[in-house]
Regions:
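Regulatory N- and C-terminal appendages and interdomain linkers associated
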Residues: 235-283
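Active-site activation/catalytic loop segments of kinase-like enzymes and analogous catalytic loops
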Residues: 23, 36, 186-226, 248-268
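Secondary-structure capping and boundary motifs in well-ordered enzyme cores
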Residues: 64, 91, 154, 158-159, ...
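Short mixed-charge
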Residues: 222-239
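Conserved ATP-binding subdomain of kinase catalytic cores across diverse folds
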Residues: 1-118
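ATP-dependent phospho-/nucleotidyl transfer catalytic cores
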Residues: 78-159, 168-171
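Active-site acidic catalytic loop and adjacent metal/ATP-binding pocket
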Residues: 1-2, 145-189
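Generic detector of well-ordered alpha-helical packing
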Residues: 35, 74-75, 160-162, 181, ...
Length: 283
């Protein structure tokens, strides 16, 4: 078993200076949502992909701190004992397949009890960072990126924090399980895909292999969607999401530029994707 124990003090100071009641409440709410996901949604994903099982949970409050404990099954003991910081494009395939299965399983699912907008970086969660951003295209088009993603008619549940560190791998790397569902909620699949690839591939691999990774993800997604949607709707979902991949990247770029403008993830690929997104939302 794994015990995830969260203690929230009455006050908190973020190392980058982003401390506010808004951020404090958002962080605590993320743990409540994770508990809700494991209780109500994780069982619906059984047979589609691997994740931990919630054994029990408990919450306690006092004047100085709030505590929440989640007792989860041990993924290491289940054969997912390996973690990675960087992968080749080919080694990303098991995670892309997991994401495709997750997005297909919850296509058109209302995010009841979860974040209405999944992810920790969407515009509504970052008013302080956005207000302090330097003037420029990212600030100018930030609201348009957000609106474009929200208005996509083909919505699903997204993991919301699908970095490589939140995936556990089998010894041969061919099977994965996901953890940390604090920011699960409504969205479109390429938000997870863009975030994952940006977390795991080198800048050169992003430039050289992003299209190959997207091809693989969309093959897996189409296959999974075809079991529950009509062929024309499968095509519509895949075409819509693929077109919005650049917007998902640009939206994350907007977050990074406000939160940590010197971040290493602001690379040539992210900048290229942002230029494409600006052209798309300006058309």
């Amino acid at each position: 078993m794994i015990i995830k124990l969260i203690s929230q003090p009455a006050t908190f100071r973020h190392p980058r200076g982003w401390s506010s009641q808004h951020s404090l409440k958002r962080k605590w709410r993320s743990y409540e949502i994770e508990q809700y996901f494991y209780t109500h949604y994780a069982p619906l994903f059984a047979g589609h992909g691997n994740l931990a099982k919630l054994i029990t949970s408990d919450a306690q409050n006092n004047e100085s701190e709030t505590h929440l404990a989640l007792v989860l099954s041990d993924l290491n003991a289940a054969g997912f004992e390996y973690r990675h910081q960087q992968l080749s494009a080919d080694a990303c395939k098991p995670v892309l397949a997991w994401l495709a299965a997750f997005h297909a399983r919850f296509i058109h699912q209302a995010p009841d009890g979860l974040w209405q907008q999944g992810s920790y970086w969407h515009l509504a969660t970052r008013p302080d960072e956005f207000s302090k951003m330097a003037e420029g295209p990212l600030k100018q088009f930030g609201p348009a990126f957000d609106k474009t993603l929200q208005q996509c008619p083909y919505r699903t549940l997204i993991h919301g924090d699908a970095k490589v560190a939140n995936f556990c791998f089998s010894a041969d790397g061919q099977a994965v399980a996901a953890v940390d569902f604090q920011y699960v909620g409504g969205g479109i699949g390429v938000q997870d895909v863009a975030y994952f690839l940006g977390s795991v591939l080198s800048e050169q691999d992003l430039l050289n292999h992003t299209e190959d990774c997207l091809d693989y993800y969309f093959r897996e997604l189409h296959s999974a969607l075809s079991k529950q949607l009509a062929p024309e709707e499968c095509e519509a979902v895949c075409n819509s999401w693929r077109q919005l991949y650049c917007v998902a990247n640009a939206d994350f770029h907007r977050f990074l530029a406000g939160w940590s403008p010197e971040h290493f993830k602001i690379n040539r690929m992210l900048q290229q994707q942002t230029e494409q997104a600006i052209a798309l939302v300006s058309a």
